[in-house]
Structures are given as structure tokens and as C-alpha cells.
Amino acid sequence: MPTDKSIIDAYNKHARAYSKRQRDNSNIYRVYLERPAIFGNLPKLQEKDVLCLGCGSGEEMEHIKSLGAKKVIGIDISEKLIEIAKESYPNFDFRVMDAENLDFPKEFFDLVFSSLTMHYLESWLKTLKSVNRVLKRDGIFIFSVTHPFFSAIQKKEDEQIKSRIFGYKDIKNTADIEIYGDYLNSYRLDAFVSKELTVSNYHRPLSIIIKEFIESGFELIDLVEPKAQDESKDKYYKFWAIHQKIPEFMIFKLKKKGQ
């Protein structure tokens, strides 16, 4: 199904605050974890045509253009984010568009780039097929999402302690068992984006993800589970230590299979 309307409404309502947070580098998860990993795994972009899917308020497009891309187009389902993007980066082409129905000719782009967008979709298959259609032969789709292990972890918090638990507690010699987390099933959950913004996204196990890649005509050529950058260690030690051992994001690099 298309992006949940409640997600669109939430991003429209908080578009200015969201955009500010993207630009002031206060989101350490982006700055020291997700963004270096996805940018570091981009292919060569000289003279390439690029689509930014879920471009938000447009910040990533300047970087992609600086790598030599010939044409960079950004799309997002949020009208307010696209409005901010057009104000901020008037030299770029921004459009309000649903990822499941990409309104471009066949084989139009060399690369489709998407940062932390796909997990807002209940089903990826229609979007994957739409992306495949607009990619040129051997074109690349690179995107990041919340890691399914991380979204499967159960959260426990009180005033003093914040815990993230996965596994089970088996009470010996009884039928009692406590299970923490749920990896193998697909379900909707709330995700904290910022102080102002909590939206729904969707957990799905890796087995479903891989099957949808195959069904939509893609070959998986790389998978990255990034650790936090070492530059964050001194200033954000807890963040750095957690993300040396526990994955929060995953980057997929797919290639359109030759016809």
C-alpha cells in the first residue's frame, strides 16, 4: 500500500522542525552512523542521472550533485517537505510523488538513492518494481532502513534505566517462558524521529526482504551493517559503544538484473 496517510500528515505538520534537525547536524544517528555508511557506498556518479526517493527537505541532493551527477531529481510524499526543499535548493528538481507509482519513463535513471524511507512502507514489493522499471540496465538502487534486528528488540524504560532486550527467559522445570522481542513476524510499530515527531513504520524479517528483491528483478550486490564512526567516541561514548556491537541501520545495494 502507499505511504500511510498518518505519516504524511505528521511530516507535513512538523516539516520545519524536521528540516532544521537535518541541517544543524544534531541527529547523531545520521551524522555518525547512517549517512557516512550510505554515502561511502555510492558508486561513481560522474555524468549519472540520479533519483532521490524520499528526499525530505533536500539536504542529501547537494552532496550527490557534488559527486558529479549530471541530473538529480528529488521526490517525497510530503508536500510541506517538498515546499521547503524548493525554497532551500531552487536549482534542483523536486516533485511530490508516491514511491509506488514513479511517474518517469522506463530506464530513466542510473541510480536511485533512498535514505531511511523504505521502512515507512507496509509492503516494499510495489515500490521495488516501480524503482526497477525506471532504472537503466544494470542500474543501482541503494537505500538504508532500520535494521530488522533493531526493530525486533523489546524496549523497557523507567526513570533510571533504558533497556533494549532480545531473547527469552526459560523458567526451569515449569511451562513458563518470557520472550523478549519479535523478529520473525511482520508488524507495525511506532518510531521516534524527533522530540516533535513520532511516526509508524514497519518491521519485516530479512527473509521477506530478500524474497521481494528477487521477485522484483534485483540482485543484491552489497549489504552494510554500519558501526558508529570513531569521531563520535569522545563526545557520545554511550552511543559509540552501543553501535560497535548492536546494529541500528542496514544499507542495501541492489542491481537491476539484465533483461
What is each stretch, according to the model?
Residues 1-45, 59-63, 81-84, 88, 141-187:
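Conserved class I S-adenosyl-L-methionine
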Residues 51-53, 57-101:
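Class I SAM-dependent methyltransferase SAM/SAH-binding core
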Residues 100-111:
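A short acidic, Gly/Pro-enriched loop at the edge of an enzyme's catalytic core
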Residues 110-125:
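A short SAM/SAH-binding and catalytic strip from SAM-dependent methyltransferases
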Residues 125-140:
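A short glycine-rich, Lys/Arg-flanked "PGG" loop and its adjoining helix->strand segment in the class I
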Residues 200-224:
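Short alpha-helix
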Residues 216, 238-259:
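Core SAM-dependent methyltransferase catalytic element
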